[in-house]
């Protein structure tokens, strides 16, 4: 590409580093949580019949977690990690095939999770496209702080994740990532 001194520089949204909030993360941002520095590697969102929920993929060395933010009466944050569906105590895909829903109670590593809700939604990877439809079943432990989710993406594709409800004050040093100029 030839150099052109008269071309307009790409205009990027300026970010006030003193006004960066957990609910407004973008790819490239870094933040501290649980004695680790995490980088936001992606920003996805879900649509549950008009209710939006944001999800950020956070990476630290070889670990990946997902921070989901939903807004009802304020922001609720959930931090989750993917697990293999086969780690759960029941053969979930077969159970759903026979009963249309997973069991009301799931035991995982000594913790009992009770069914709380189910939703049909659309997932927008990187916030783009028409979205992929899925069904999610959400569970909570007795304290209602730990979560388990089962997602069905097709007749034979299931995913599971374990998580916990977190508070925004548990995250610190939220900084915008380096801005690179397009050439």
Predicted feature residues:
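Mixed-charge, low-complexity intrinsically disordered regions
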Residues: 1-183
């Amino acid at each position: 590409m030839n150099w052109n001194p008269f071309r307009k520089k790409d205009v990027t949204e300026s970010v006030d580093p003193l006004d960066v909030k957990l609910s407004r993360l973008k790819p490239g941002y870094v933040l501290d949580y649980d004695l680790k520095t995490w980088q936001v590697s992606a920003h996805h969102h879900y649509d549950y019949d008009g209710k939006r929920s944001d999800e950020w993929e956070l990476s630290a060395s070889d670990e990946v977690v997902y921070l989901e933010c939903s807004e009802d009466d304020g922001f609720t944050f959930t931090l989750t990690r993917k697990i293999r569906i086969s780690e759960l105590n029941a053969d979930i895909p077969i159970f759903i095939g026979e009963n249309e829903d997973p069991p009301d109670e799931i035991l995982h590593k000594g913790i009992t999770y009770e069914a709380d809700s189910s939703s049909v939604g659309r997932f927008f990877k990187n916030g783009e496209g028409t979205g992929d439809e899925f069904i999610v079943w959400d569970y909570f432990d007795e304290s209602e702080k730990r979560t388990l989710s089962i997602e069905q993406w097709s007749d034979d594709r299931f995913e599971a994740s374990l998580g916990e409800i977190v508070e925004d004050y548990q995250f610190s040093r939220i900084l915008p990532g380096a801005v690179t100029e397009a050439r």
